[in-house]
Amino acid sequence: MLTSMQDVPPAPPGTRIAYSRGEFQVGDLRVPSGRGPHPVAIVIHGGYWRARYDLKEVEHLCEAVTRQGLATWSLEYRRIGNPGGGWPGTLDDVRTGAAHLEKIATERSLDLKRVVAMGHSAGGHLVLWLAKQNAIALRGIVALAPVADLRRAWELKLSGTVVADLLGGSPQDLSDRYRSASPIELVPLGVAQRVLHGTNDDVVPLEISRRYVAAAKESGDDSKLIEVAGAGHFELIDPQSSAWPVVKETVLELVNKTP
């Protein structure tokens, strides 16, 4: 079983574009062949917000999505261990990077009326958070095994102290930060959400997605949980896996969804 998408050969690179001045404030843009304007998938990688994981994790996913006719805008961001990473820099970068599409849309022939955001693991947390920020209009969110409840993740000690490392402390000490950063506390998001989670995920418990979607539905959001039978954590970002068709179809459903 894959332990990381870094275990497979690299995909062809996208076009690297800076959305701010810092070393890690960049994104990789891939645009499909043919005339635009092209719909867009904002893609945010996971890795528990830590610096040792980067956007290489989702290169193959981006290539596969681009083959379906969508441009992909894969964001790097300051992470725990980078200068300025954690609270609030990590979140600020995601918001700024997403908003940067407005500046490059005309030149790159991007259709900003058809934008979805997809993220994996910690990136799933970040895309759900992004939906509440009004950085850019979104048709929908595809959250793949998201860390959607930061208080619960802290209670479970997922990846050790990483949630406290991200936000700077515990929920008891920094309740307002958890309230501002945790998707389950931000619902309703007002954007369609499709949450995919493997039933064999041993990195982010399925329980977290179940709790999140229940809360989102209760708030009135169009939120749906898709439990992918037999899939672990990384199969959801592997275009060669048996889980990929449902990921692909979910992205296409949302990008073509009537506003």
Task: Please give the residue ranges for each predicted region.
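Alpha/beta-hydrolase active-site loop
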Residues: 85-106
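Hydrolase active-site cap/lid region
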Residues: 129-174
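Short beta-strand/loop motif that positions the catalytic acidic residue
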Residues: 189, 195-197, 201
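Gly/Ser-rich "nucleophile elbow"/oxyanion-hole loop immediately N-terminal to the catalytic nucleophile
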Residues: 100-116, 121
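C-terminal catalytic histidine-bearing segment of alpha/beta-hydrolase fold enzymes
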Residues: 30, 203, 210-259
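Short amphipathic alpha-helix adjacent to the substrate-entry channel of hydrolases
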Residues: 55-73
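N-terminal cap/lid segment of alpha/beta-hydrolase-fold proteins
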Residues: 1-35
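Glycine-rich nucleophile elbow surrounding the catalytic serine of serine-hydrolase chemistry
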Residues: 119-129
